[in-house]
Amino acid sequence: METFANGMTLDVTVDALAPGGKAVCRHEGRVIFVDRGLPGQQLHVRLTTVRKRFAEAECLAVVTHTADECDPFCPHFGDCGGCTWQNLPYPAQLAWKERFVRDSLQRIGRIEAPNVLPTLPSPLQQGFRNKMEFAFTTDDREMLHLGLRRRGGHEVVDVTSCGLQTATTCRVVTTARDIARASGLPGWDDAAHRGFWRFLVVREPARGGQCLVQCITAPHPEAEHVARAFFTALRQAVPEVTGCVHSIRSQNSQVAYGDATVFTEGEIVLTEKLGAIELDFGHDTFLQTNTRATELLYGEVERMAGLSGREHVWDLYCGVGSIALWLAEHAATICGMEATPASVEAAQRNAQAAGCTHCDFVAGDVRALLRSRSKGKAQEPIPDVVVTDPPRAGMHPDVIDALLQTAPARIVYVSCDPATMARDVGLLMQRYTLHEARPVDLFPHTPHVETVVLLSNKEVDDTISTTV
């Protein structure tokens, strides 16, 4: 067997795709994960990491293409790290996402034959994002850039167009880049931890017509003055910009989130229509980025919850209350729990505007909130159904323990990561039965997938049926 070493180059054939999108190849019986590639392609690769049981590699060239490929629609594809599957036909993307969910439940959750339904496609495959995050940087020639991260690195690609965002967002980015360059202040330098311009976040409801722009900069004596001039020029050039937020970020980590808000201008609360409900949201609240596909996702949550109007529901990690309000007309009471105070305030406003007086939202760490409820310290009834939509890391073991102790009849688990979902579902299987899992594609042209899972309490009802 050939000895692997970092820097070695090989020709390999892609056998499959791994969750996260890496290409799975084999060479003399050893597995190699390559940063890009499609099944059937022959790649020329360079090994970057060698482990005992596998190796990682970067693709230097595609030696042989496959007949199953399609032409990417974006001029930045292959350079920008935003979406990696534009050359994979959409039906194949859906099939691989279903496989990722099934494989995760089998391999991580140790569920022998999980009932995984076909992936629901996104109604839109282009122009679907209601939020985009862009990064500033300055190169060695002192040229400022604003765009998306280059694949596998910290450099920024000046995107001139993007198939995932709207035409309005494209105009905002192009204009903002020109204004920032004219300021003479540098973009952020990751290595040196210095610079002024850091991030631009654009949020635009699906119905269009207005957008909210957040500019995040480093602290600077003239930061507010520069930012006000920036927004004045931006709003003159792009009238759809109806609200502006200037935030500062002192931390070095590359996260598009401000430590503090310096000032706001205009309308800083937007409204998104989701099915029959309307949701207010701002720059610091979470909302799914694909509105039309989110309606399909929530439709699956509603179907699996199987509410008749008599049930008490807990909505964990509820955000701005979107799932709670979607289910409100079918539930007796709903209690939403969320760690971010701004999101809870938005959820309360949304519920009040919708006339949902039976919906309550509580701010606090979900672990602590569940702990107090499991000890009988809260006034809410014991839930019949729990909907949980945790962050990518999944649920803390304490949350899982609290759910096992509370033992609702049904748990509907909404996940953005098949691996952590499968881990959590596997732990819940000691008291629950997995009825079905439904992947939903909120992120076309990427390997990311949302999943809705239905679990039923073995001691309460082991014969649940749902209509697909």
Swiss-Prot record:
Its EC number is 2.1.1.-. It is an enzyme of class 2 (transferase). Keywords: 4Fe-4S, Iron, Iron-sulfur, Metal-binding, Methyltransferase, S-adenosyl-L-methionine, Transferase. The active site is at C416. InterPro entries: MeTrfase_TrmA_AS (IPR030390), MeTrfase_TrmA_CS (IPR030391), NA-bd_OB-fold (IPR012340), SAM-dependent_MTases_sf (IPR029063), TRAM_dom (IPR002792), U5_MeTrfase_fam (IPR010280). [4Fe-4S] cluster binds at C74, C80, C83, C162. One of its GO terms (molecular function) is metal ion binding. Pfam families: TRAM, tRNA_U5-meth_tr. S-adenosyl-L-methionine binds at Q288, Y317, E338, D389. GO terms for biological process: methylation; RNA modification; RNA processing. Residues 3-61 form the TRAM domain. Belongs to the class I-like SAM-binding methyltransferase superfamily. RNA M5U methyltransferase family. PANTHER family: RNA M5U METHYLTRANSFERASE, TRNA (URACIL(54)-C(5))-METHYLTRANSFERASE. This is Uncharacterized RNA methyltransferase DVU_0924.
